[in-house]
């Protein structure tokens, strides 16, 4: 709640829980693209597509711990779907 009352806390929250995660994953995706493991593209967009559902599911678990099992299943499904979208199969480069 304080992040909405205090601009400095809101900025800190955004940096810590959004921007840093996106930047970190974008760098991982840049490395994977360079290595030919995943398809190329906008690494920041890939990072947002990957991280946003994770942040959402963590938020659900924080507010409703009894839904942890459900959220973990959704997370597994998300990771599998994301992987199938970006992974280059041997002999199947775009």
Say what each PLM segment does.
Residues 8-34, 44-48:
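Amphipathic alpha-helical packing segments from all-alpha helical-bundle domains
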Residues 39-60, 73-81:
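Hydrophobic alpha-helical segments that form the core
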